[in-house]
Amino acid sequence: MAKDEIIEFEGEVIDTLPNTLFKVRLENGHEIIAHISGKMRKHYIRILTGDKVKVEMTPYDLSKGRITYRGKN
């Protein structure tokens, strides 16, 4: 997949699910299921309910995404 096809959104974690999955409400109001990117997992970055995050999505499946950044609170 080419980098230019990735869609990036900001959102807020509203629920934590098993296996490092999270329910995220995007800034446009949609709710998606997102997982942590590999670098965040490698560096043990913790994500909690209420955190502001940046999510990458593909145009092929707009119900799933990858969390790439956790905002500083």
From Swiss-Prot:
Residues 1-72 form the S1-like domain. Its main location: cytoplasm. One of its GO terms (molecular function) is rRNA binding. InterPro entries: NA-bd_OB-fold, RNA-binding_domain_S1_IF1, S1_domain, TIF_IF1. Gene3D superfamilies: Nucleic acid-binding proteins. One of its GO terms (cellular component) is cytosol. It comes from the Bacteria. The keyword Chloroplast does not apply. Signal peptide: none annotated. Keywords: Cytoplasm, Initiation factor, Protein biosynthesis, RNA-binding, rRNA-binding. The keyword rRNA-binding applies. It is found in: Cytoplasm. One of the essential components for the initiation of protein synthesis. Stabilizes the binding of IF-2 and IF-3 on the 30S subunit to which N-formylmethionyl-tRNA(fMet) subsequently binds. Helps modulate mRNA selection, yielding the 30S pre-initiation complex (PIC). Upon addition of the 50S ribosomal subunit IF-1, IF-2 and IF-3 are released leaving the mature 70S translation initiation complex. Belongs to the IF-1 family. Component of the 30S ribosomal translation pre-initiation complex which assembles on the 30S ribosome in the order IF-2 and IF-3, IF-1 and N-formylmethionyl-tRNA(fMet); mRNA recruitment can occur at any time during PIC assembly. This is Translation initiation factor IF-1. The gene is infA.
